[in-house]
């Protein structure tokens, strides 16, 4: 009797294994077909990836557009050093009717890690110099006199500085989840959280301990407490995205499994600390590049921000107040539902905003 039961169990397990193996094979076939389909080059368009020599380093970019004659948009990811190329290609496809979109993994990260990892800290000057060098390369390679910048989160402040310092190189600057001045944003964050925790004595007392003059890393425990107790806006990227995150990851034409693993799961904590000089969040870069008192732009300025972006570094109130002070040949603002990542998650609204910008530039 026992032998009969064991045989049945083995048979069931065997069939379960066959079914699982079959599902894996089907998923891999779907991935292969999807990658091939989305890696096609549009007629009259462009679809390329390459490693560019930038200031003594190799840095990965992808270039995609439906028409080579369209203007060029360079996306500068946030972090710092948090490329989204493992899943963001679907966002840029939505912009590709109006712009040839260049997605850039900055030095030492994304597709560049670990093969082209850096061995010493990256400074704000390095970041700005890389942005200028890549701009010059793209203008030469794609036959343009100028390009448009789109910087998100930490790198919104780099995009703004590049446009402020080198208006001759840019048609416009678009910033999302804008950092204006990190210390001021931390001050406003404290005010916001004091109001949010007024009926929670324990967390209210914790918020009172926040010193806006100190970096997040010096007060990490308080911010973690706030997050653990629900006092932080954390997007559900799978529910809120206006494109399929699963498809964007699984059928990504620009990433292998290994590259996606390195970008999503690899523990780079010690590497990050080395790169940022000990500040894993990299606030020092933002402090050096504050644009609080730099509101005179010689190029059009456009802001897209989540209405509920109460991230400690990108408080929506600070971003909107800065926008109101900006003087530029043209400016516009798009507030979308959601928090810190919503300028990318709400990619249909981003595409409509970018289309509007493109129409103005014609």
What role is predicted for each listed range?
Residues 310-318:
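Conserved alpha/beta-hydrolase "acid-adjacent" motif
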Residues 126-146:
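Conserved acidic catalytic loop of the alpha/beta-hydrolase fold
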Residues 202-292, 299:
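Alpha/beta-hydrolase
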Residues 95-114:
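Conserved alpha/beta-hydrolase
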Residues 165-215:
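A catalytic-pocket lid/entrance helix-loop region that shapes and gates access to the active site
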Residues 80-92:
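The serine-hydrolase catalytic nucleophile loop
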Residues 297, 303-305:
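Short beta-strand/loop motif that positions the catalytic acidic residue
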Residues 311, 338-347:
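Catalytic histidine-centered segment of alpha/beta-hydrolase-like enzymes
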